[in-house]
Amino acid sequence: MIGLRQNSNGASGVVWVHTRGLNQMDQVVLDYVRWVMVRKRDPDAPAPDAVVPDLAPAVPPEALIVPEGLDFTGYDFELAGEPHRWGDYALGEIIDHVDGVTIEEAEHMLATRLWQNTAKVHFDATFRDDGRRLIYGGHVISMARALSFNGLANAQMIVALNGGAHANPCFCLLYTSDAADER
């Protein structure tokens, strides 16, 4: 843990975690910082001194790794379905990703488990005052990336994420019926 700050509501806070993954030769193969909002165990406990890590605004280009031997000389733009390349985009351009998707409870919970997020608020509808499961932000960001394929079909790999946010909560709707059985 490299940072901690209480939110203005006093009931939760943000925890920054630095994760490094090493292979069998002790070489770094994964290195990232993420932040998570968590509830305080005791909402009445005084706020700890805030420690907000100083993070780089972007991954420096020299840290971006393209796999050795990657070769796109035979790449077929017609088969990919879009002709657009790097030079076809302009700073500030808006791309309309026309596809949409409904976020499903089962997919959200599976993805949340795969990311090893065990926060009860994502699984137990009784854990929130409004009785709704909160959709895990990593799932929302993953869905956004998947939908971005339409408009960025020739983007072959993600070499870094410089940041990401979903500014508002996302929920699945629970449908119920009051219809009586009239057999």
Predicted regions and their residues:
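Conserved small/polar residues in nucleotide/adenosyl-binding loops
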Residues: 175-182
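Active-site beta-strand->loop segment that positions catalytic residues and contacts the acyl thioester
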Residues: 1-10, 22, 162-174
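Short, basic/aromatic beta-hairpin or loop at an interaction surface
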Residues: 67-73, 146-158
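Short, surface-exposed secondary-structure boundary micro-motifs
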Residues: 2-4, 34, 100
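Non-catalytic linker/capping segments at the edges of enzyme domains
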Residues: 39-131
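Extended, compositionally biased flexible segments
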Residues: 126-142, 153-161, 166
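Short aromatic-glycine-enriched beta-strand elements
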Residues: 10-18
